[in-house]
Curated annotation (Swiss-Prot):
One of its GO terms (biological process) is protein insertion into membrane. The keyword Cell membrane applies. Belongs to the OXA1/ALB3/YidC family. Type 1 subfamily. NCBIfam families: PRK01318.1-3, PRK01318.1-4, yidC_nterm, yidC_oxa1_cterm. The chain crosses the membrane at residues 7-24, 367-387, 437-457, 476-496, 511-531. It comes from Burkholderia lata (strain ATCC 17760 / DSM 23089 / LMG 22485 / NCIMB 9086 / R18194 / 383). This is Membrane protein insertase YidC. It is a multi-pass membrane protein. One of its GO terms (cellular component) is plasma membrane. It is found in: Cell inner membrane. Interacts with the Sec translocase complex via SecD. Specifically interacts with transmembrane segments of nascent integral membrane proteins during membrane integration. Its main location: membrane. Signal peptide: none annotated.
Length: 555
């Protein structure tokens, strides 16, 4: 029994350490176990054959000034304005300085009835900066520091009979080039069309490069206590797939990612929500990510444009996603975009679990009851393994008095004590590890479900019953955490009492320690653990009673 408990404690300890290590990596700190790519391989030189490595690749000519910054003192001052707009999914503001998306509120998250659930994704205030901007490189061309003029000002709201809203902004002429930037907002869509028309109004050919970037600070938003998720830039290409970039690596100029591709996208990821520039596929572009201010970072692409003769123009089309990390929707927008909803190392198990949770919800219509039913189905699938574990625990409980007697008898001779215990196990046909393996097999599934519930924006604002109005927030009255503590205490009391007094005290202390931590967990997560514990108690009670009845029957 001591061996089994030791194994379980080792598993518990390792799980706690791995969760802490994941928290470390999610916050941009180095892993305790896994070196970053920059520690294991030298970064490739800019323009090298591998196309990866950011130690020598920066944004180059991309201006670093944030939107809203004062124009150069050598240029005549121009007054920028904020153009407000509204659609069925967005309320936002476009800054005429650069034609930059300076504010974007996702009002559909509140379904128009719960303003407290609205999320402001893009913003530019004294305390928070998060922008989507673009411009030209390759000469003294218009960029995000120049003041644009709104074309055809008028309707800035999506009316009932409109399917799309277009807002266009024209730059001043610089370097013989004029830019017209058009945003297209489509009804019901979180994908914004961004068309950059480049007119050569000069007398010589020009070869500009379009840059598109996301700029933000490292301030976390809507992150549950004790449940930290990734915040920062990300890059996706066919060659390297999904690559997260930690802010700490950008601080040290040691980030490692693909810097050249003709496919994929760049993104800024946070809990529940993301934004991503998605250039045209098949068009060569450079990728960059860097720190541009003590608290500001950016990730973007630079896409060269073929030479434009005088009097001619060129169009560069791209898409800008800004919305919730709804897995099915993301899959239909761009290859790999669903990976911004990051399950980490348990993705292979978590994705099928979320698919099943979605299917259940499509029939039930309530995410809380869907969690309950999914937990019930998982427990049913693992019932044979759980039964084997509980049977082993019941048999160990029966022989515990004899084990204690042997320990007392041979306490001065550990070798004889171990031999006697092994002989007892052999005689009674008990495997001291019999209860461990079934538990170990189930651990990845339960960890996966934890990450599914933590990462799914569908839980945000989703009610369950009575006092639970938002499964992504903590229980306002702490009823579920109390039930969690009670269920853990009952479950612990059903197990054999450890012979070691220290272990016995720790087993009694665990429900209290866990309940304190779960007081701050999202209600959906606590609901899952409560249901899982209650079902485990029912299983253990049933199997123990069944074994007890079977033993009495022959007598």
């Amino acid at each position: 029994m001591d061996i089994k408990r030791t194994v379980l404690w080792v598993i518990f300890f390792m799980s706690a350490v791995m969760l802490y290590d994941n928290w470390q990596r999610s916050h941009g700190r180095p892993s305790m176990f896994f070196p970053s790519a920059t520690q294991t391989a030298p970064a490739a030189a800019a323009g090298g054959a591998s196309g990866t490595g950011a130690t020598t690749t920066t944004a180059g000519e991309v201006p670093a000034a944030a939107a809203g910054a004062a124009p150069s003192t050598t240029a005549p001052a121009a007054q920028a304005q904020l153009v407000k707009f509204s659609t069925d999914v967005y309320d936002g503001e476009i800054d005429t300085r650069g034609g930059t998306l300076a504010k974007l509120t996702l009002k559909k998250q509140g379904d128009g009835k719960q303003p407290d659930l609205y999320i402001t994704l893009f913003d530019h205030t004294a305390g928070h900066t998060y922008l989507a901007r673009s411009g030209l490189l390759g000469g003294d061309f218009p960029n995000h520091n120049d003041v644009y003029t709104q074309l055809n000002p008028g309707t800035t709201s999506l009316t009932g009979d409109q399917n799309a809203l277009k807002l266009s902004f024209e730059s001043p002429v610089k370097g013989g080039v004029k830019v017209v930037k058009t945003y297209t907002f489509t009804r019901g869509s979180y994908v914004i069309g961004v068309d950059t028309k480049i007119d050569n109004v000069g007398t010589a050919p020009v070869t500009p490069t379009v840059y598109m970037e996301l700029v933000r600070d490292n301030t976390a938003v809507e992150t549950p206590m004790f449940s930290h998720t990734f915040l920062g830039p990300a890059v996706y290409t066919d060659a390297k797939h999904f690559q997260k970039i930690n802010f700490s690596d950008l601080d040290k100029n040691k980030a490692d990612y693909v810097t050249s591709a003709d496919n994929g996208w760049v993104a800024m990821v946070q809990h529940y929500f993301a934004s991503a520039w998605i250039p045209q596929q098949g068009v060569k572009r450079d990728i960059y990510a860097e720190k541009i201010d003590p608290t500001l970072y950016r990730v973007g692409v630079k896409q060269p444009v073929a030479a434009i003769a005088p009097g001619q123009s060129a169009d560069v089309q791209a898409r800008l996603f800004a919305g919730p990390e709804e897995e099915r929707m993301l899959e239909g927008i761009a290859p790999g975009l669903e990976l911004v909803k990051d399950y980490g190392w348990v993705t292979i198990i978590a994705k099928p679990l979320f698919w099943l949770l979605e299917k259940i919800h499509s029939y039930i219509g309530n995410w809380g009851w869907s969690i309950v039913l999914l937990t019930l189905l998982i427990k049913a699938v693992f019932f044979p393994l759980s039964a084997a574990s509980y049977k082993s625990m019941a048999r160990m409980k029966e022989i515990t008095p004899r084990m204690q007697a042997l320990r007392e008898r041979f306490k001065s001779d550990p070798q004889k004590m171990n031999s006697a215990l092994m002989e007892l196990y052999k005689t009674e046909k008990v495997n001291p590890f019999g209860g461990c393996l079934p538990v170990v097999i189930q651990i990845p599934v339960f960890i996966s479900l934890y990450w599914v519930l933590l990462a799914s924006v569908e839980m945000r604002g989703a009610p369950w019953v009575l006092w639970i109005h938002d499964l992504s927030q903590r229980d306002p009255f702490f009823i579920l955490p109390v039930l969690m503590a009670v269920s853990m205490y009952v479950q612990t009391s059903l197990n054999p009492t450890p012979p070691d007094p220290v272990q016995a005290k720790m087993m009694k202390f665990m429900p209290i320690a866990f309940s304190v931590m779960f007081f701050f967990f999202p209600a959906g997560l606590v609901l899952y653990y409560v249901v899982n514990n209650v079902l485990s108690i029912a299983q253990q009670y049933y199997i123990t009673r069944k074994l007890g009845g079977a033993k009495k029957k022959p007598a």
